[in-house]
Amino acid sequence: MSTIDFEAKLYEINSWTILRLPEDASEKLPSRGMTMVSGTINGVPFKTLLEPDGRYAPGQKPSHWFRPDKTLLDDASAKAGDTVHVSLEPTKDWIEPEVPEDLKKALAASPKAEALWNDITPLARWDWVRWIRAVKTPATRQKHIDVALDKLNKGMRRPCCFNRNLCSEPYVSHNWVLIEPMQATEKMTT
């Protein structure tokens, strides 16, 4: 697949700096769901998971987004509000997800589930992590961890009934859709 080049504005949603791909750039990706990419921002290299923005209804233009970390932003001399030059190339080499501490602890207490966790692909681990983090309350999150352990103990390699095209990060989404920067500003002022 060829390199996808574009310019995009960095937005702040809540306290996170977000880069949302233009729809025409997102269209060139191999998947509407999460996609692993290598690329550059203002010439500074990175590798990350692109999350879907959750827009998929008729008439909507779906896209992807990611949260550049502080080091990448500093090295690229970029901040929220700036327009940056981005080059992306999809890759099949998936980086490991950051496993939340509560899930690490639960896996460590369940050797059978942990053994399967270590055997599944990084993509499958991303599915589990995204499914677990996609909830807002601690009680529901714990329920998702308990269900994940039960399924892993039964040999199930992926969560069931999880739409990979939705935005699974509750801090920057509402009803599984990435919050628009204007909505984030309106929420903060009301």
Model region roles, listed by residue range:
Residues 1-62, 76-103, 160:
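Long, compositionally biased stretches
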Residues 1, 62, 79, 87, ...:
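Mature exported/compartmentalized surface modules and terminal targeting/interaction regions
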Residues 36, 70, 114:
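Short glycine-/small-residue-rich flexible loop motifs, especially phosphate/cofactor-binding loops
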Residues 69-75:
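Short alpha-helix capping/helix-loop boundary micro-motifs
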Residues 21, 67-68:
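A conserved hydrophobic position in a structured secondary element of the catalytic/binding core
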